[in-house]
Amino acid sequence: MRVRRSLPWLSLIALGLAVAPVRSAADEEDDAAEVRYRVRTDAALERMTVEVCFAGAPPRSLGPGIDRAGPALLDARKGAQALTVRRGRIDTSGLSDGDCLTYRVDLDQARRASRFSNRQGVDFVGSQGAWLWRSRRRPPEHATIRFDLPDGLRVAAPWPREGDGYRLNRSAFRRPAFVAFGRFEPIRVSSHGVDAELVRLGDGWDFTAEDTTAWLRTAIEGVSTVQGRFPVSNLLIVFAPGDGSGVGFGMVRRGGGCSVGFIVGRHSSADALRESWVTWHELSHLQLPPMVQEDAWLYEGLATYYQEVLQARMGVQSPEQAWAALRDGFRRGARGRERDALAVEAENMHRTYAYQRVYWAGTAFALEADVALRQRGSSLDEALRRGARTWRGGPGVWRSERLTALLDRSFDAPVLGPLRDTYARRVAFPPTAELLERLGVGRGGRLRAAPLESVRDAIMSR
């Protein structure tokens, strides 16, 4: 049986979108000690008015989290006094301690500045960086945001609740999140240690809210088989409609909390939802903390590995199908052009398009690591379960050296660190045929008796 899995970026390119973080130039501003935001919109969600109050000294200027959102700024005022605006930045140098200002944003223009934005009638989703102005060099350490919306409108955001609003940490100003506004009815599930909220943009979905809830519960249950609980405590998921059937594309964002945007066929069946591998890939990213781009081989590889493993564990596909998908992926990864060390390829993959090699070499690492740990009486599941106690909910971006050093602490001798070093420096695609032979995985995923068949079977078991 020939099994192919397209990588998420292929669906993204087909939709005319682009994967990229929020990028902005640093300036020389200082941050305020505490900032309070109050957000209002009109009923059509065409205009947004934001009041910003500073508990301490204001910064010298405020700007958007996304540079190209600057033209969306309509005006800014302190009371009746107009404030100077230059290239989308608000001059706040004349404000005093404890002052407030108000600015207005054209939401359609802001949405167009936000990558992976989508509007369906009134409902829309985009990055907060397109409408949340802040000090850009040093964002506030403590901030809250409150939404006062017209009747019938809702906001869905991934940030921790505080009173009648949300609490924003610095990552909410430094990284994008998916934030949705509209007339949707949220679907909420609390299970396996996570409070999850899901919203669907627009009308005309063929699958029901009950189908969506079942999909979400199954996904949470499956992902939780790795660490014994869901890897994060709060999660926002946004469904934007697309063509085709099932989940066609997904993206994880971690600005102030974890959010995932999915493009889903509006006319999908419940079975098509359940059988979409993109679900498992994107949610598996949450098993790890945020990591630097040069380690994309590790975090994309681990997500690709678990997308197959978790489907087998949940009965979405058979173990034979999962092994066939992995074997086929290794073959495609090995066909990629070998230019540089894997870590270098990962850092440059959006420029060189070396996605197949980066993803599948990282998947080979995950498989080899899992097998090595299981031979020692542990597993990759167990290593992640222990490591997550350190990074869950914490700030900062990790490097693979630090990550593997943490995971190796429970072993008599380092296992993952040396393997990580070998893979990061490797130019040639890793040899996988011998390992698959020892696991008893043949062509088409056919399984046979082999020295490591017990390890093979345990990987796909719950």
Give, region by region, the residue ranges found by the protein language model.
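Bacterial N-terminal signal peptides
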Residues: 9-18
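Beta/coil-rich, acidic/histidine-enriched accessory regions frequently appended to metallopeptidases
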Residues: 27-53, 392-462
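A surface-exposed beta-strand-loop module
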Residues: 40-42, 68-119
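Extended, low-hydrophobicity, Ser/Thr/Pro/Gly-biased non-transmembrane segments
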Residues: 55, 104-185
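Solvent-exposed beta-hairpin/edge-strand motifs
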Residues: 57-87, 142-161
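Zn2+-dependent metallopeptidase catalytic core
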Residues: 74, 129, 140-156, 167-174, ...
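Juxtacatalytic substrate-recognition/specificity segment
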Residues: 187-295, 306
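Acidic/His/Gly-enriched intrinsically disordered linker/tail segments
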Residues: 294-364, 370, 385, 389-394
